[in-house]
Amino acid sequence: MAAELEYESVLCVKPDVSVYRIPPRASNRGYRASDWKLDQPDWTGRLRITSKGKIAYIKLEDKVSGELFAQAPVEQYPGIAVETVADSSRYFVIRIQDGTGRSAFIGIGFTDRGDAFDFNVSLQDHFKWVKQETEISKESQEMDSRPKLDLGFKEGQTIKLSIGNITAKKGGTSKPRASGTGGLSLLPPPPGGKVTIPPPSSSVAISNHVTPPPIPKSNHGSNDSDILLDLDSPAPVPTSAPAPAPASTSNDLWGDFSTASSSVPNQAPQPSNWVQF
């Protein structure tokens, strides 16, 4: 099932590569590119490195049609599937395999040194990733194999909790909380809140309003002196229950004013700057 979920990814593509038929290795000193016919390559085409799972594939394909010429599966690098030559960094020896399991060793070379560097680094990065994945899988297996710590309560096991300094009185009962509609407790108003007093209605009389007393009219309406006397006289202050004044005293006061006015000879009215109210 895991093999079916694996997909093939492309690691490197080089458009120009040469293939050489190499002679058998005579000793363990390694391959040498100088022993090959470098000026007469046996095949030229395109190189493509792909990966599927942990295995990398070096594919030699035709430049135009993309037809597969040879394929070299690589399970480990560096290893027997890909080897470097002793006298150059642009040439390698790879082991190709067909569908029947037969294998052969051929030499490949790049005209550009940068292409050879990319070929080498692509294989190194892939197998570095494979190594990291292997280590992660081993760690996960070790974690699964360890006995798990059981922190659950056993059957019938109880615990006792001590919460702060809270002590309950003997024989006392807890006070029920006041709850509002729907069983929700009501919170007190916030401190410093202002209480708005509604304004008084129009039907309520204002106690501070005082009706001014009427000004008594004088018998001599045309006389300016009477007007001045009326202005100089203090206004009566209303009380809660004014006592009626004796009639004789009022008549004596007005009699004095009458006597004074009768003793003054009649004179023609003079213009005054006062405005008559």
UniProtKB/Swiss-Prot annotation:
Short sequence motif named WXXF motif 1, residue ranges: 254-257
Tissue expression summary: Expressed predominantly in brain (at protein level).
Entry GO terms, CC: clathrin vesicle coat; clathrin-coated pit; plasma membrane; presynapse
Function: Involved in endocytosis.
Biased composition (Pro residues): 187-201, 235-245
Domain of life: Eukaryota
Comment on protein domains: The WXXF motifs mediate binding of accessory proteins to the ear-domain of AP-1, GGAs and AP-2 through hydrophobic interactions. Selective binding to the GAE domains of AP-1 or to the alpha-ear domain of AP-2 is tuned by the acidic context surrounding the motif and the properties of the second residue of the motif itself. The WXXF motif 1, which is preceded by an acidic residue and has a glycine in second position mediates specific interaction with AP-1. The WXXF motif 2, which is followed by the C-terminal carboxyl group negative charge, allows specific interaction with AP-2.
UniProt key word Transport: yes
Gene designation per UniProt: Necap1
Protein family per UniProt: Belongs to the NECAP family.
Stretches with biased composition (Polar residues): 258-277
Residues where Phosphothreonine is found: T211
Ranges where the record places region Disordered: 164-277
Self-association state and partner proteins as the record states: Interacts with AP1G1 and AP2A1 components of the adapter protein complexes AP-1 and AP-2. Interacts with the GAE domain proteins GGA1, GGA2 and GGA3. Interacts with AP2A2.
Name this polypeptide is given: Adaptin ear-binding coat-associated protein 1
The entry's keywords: Cell membrane, Cytoplasmic vesicle, Endocytosis, Membrane, Phosphoprotein, Protein transport, Repeat, Transport
Signal peptide, first to last residue: none
Annotated InterPro entries: NECAP_PHear, PH-like_dom_sf
Cell compartment(s), UniProt: Cytoplasmic vesicle, Clathrin-coated vesicle membrane; Cell membrane
Segments of skewed composition (Low complexity): 222-234
Coiled coil ranges: none
GO biological process, one term: endocytosis
